[in-house]
Amino acid sequence: MDQAGDAQARDAVEQCDAVVIGGGPGGSTAAALLARRGYKVVALEKDHHPRFHIGESLLPMNLPVFERLGVLEKVRAMGVFKAGADFEADNERGYNTYAFDRAIGNSPPHAFQVWRQDFDKMLYEHARECGADAREGHEVKRVEQAGPRESLLDVSTDRGESYRLRARYVVDASGRDAFFASRKKLRRKNPAHQSAAIFGHFRGARTREGEDAGNISIYNFDYGWMWMIPLPDGVMSVGAVARPEYLKQRKSSPREFLLQTLQQVPALWQRLQQAELIDDEVRVTGNYSYDASAMGGPGWILVGDAFAFLDPVFSSGVYLAMSGAEKAVEVVDRALRDPACEMTLMRKLEKRQRAAMKRFAFFIYRFNGPVMQKMFRQPRNIWQLEQGVISMLAGDLFDMPLVLRKLRLFKLVYAVYTLRDWRRARRERKYRLAQARLQFSGGTTPLDPA
């Protein structure tokens, strides 16, 4: 091509109805559903699938989303059956099982654990099958407003090419990159909670017995909590989420530090006696709890981690991203047909998402505190409080009045217990807020800033 042809190619602007930034669960969901509604959708993922991602444990409330999306059987085929979540307890077994089939809401009685690289790839390919133009190795570099709602996007490929897109709407599902929130200076560090994680994958770890074999197991230690997540092919995801102070003191290699950390919980370490760390590979990441001060504006909307990220303890990330993407598609669809209703719908959705995150946050912020630990280690189902917690663990936090009433009652009981030991609770809160002011910068994953 001659120079004139090159210039013409650069100046050409490709037209579409919607651009979706990011090829994770939220982005793939949005792209698939918008394409199904007849819109011309371009989905842009800067990497290539399959690519590694943490967050392997799904919630029961994911299942209705999978069914509406048309991928439930694909998830079932690739996942490990998850009947519940196990937490340490002062009983003969050493743990309590919060079985999902005891939930009081309408949540399904089980979930799945998946390899995220396979799960994310399947969802992205499904978006393509639904009609989205799903591109990989294409990174959005800049977005500028081209009208009241339209946007112009500058895109670069990993082959060294560049082009422009004009979109009537942009869905930002860029994950922790938080493309729009970062560039529009909307991103806010969470002043109440920060943590960091270190983890690896083991082969040969001991699972629970019987129906509990596929459960996620949660353990506590002095600086945070640990997980064990059974994955396909006999692999166990094992890691620790800790206050930044703990990870910042690491002087040994990531492998040595992980093993030293896991040994602090004998019940977990015992399950790893016959296990082998796969490829001796250990990853470290900061969780960087944050949110955006606004979910969207004229012609753009944030989905999933591009809007907010809390903490992985209750495995809520994939569900909040995909369910949020479903609702975001409704906003985009209505806004493209009737722009006058856009901001009203967006404010309603933002209020809904923030309310669910606030309900999760109540448990997350206090999870390592003495009162919450006592309530999880010695659960009592008076007034169906334990079943209300199970519904929360299942992700049923939006539209079930009975569940929300039980969670409000749980908070009241928590307050009573806290008053009994208010000095200790105050010390824990003071420590948590001090940790939230720290910044951990030792991450080794692509999600962590260099």
Task: Please tell me what each predicted stretch does.
Residues R10-G24:
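Beta1/beta-strand and adjacent pyrophosphate-binding region of the FAD-binding site
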Residues R51-E92:
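N-terminal FAD cofactor-binding segment of flavoenzymes
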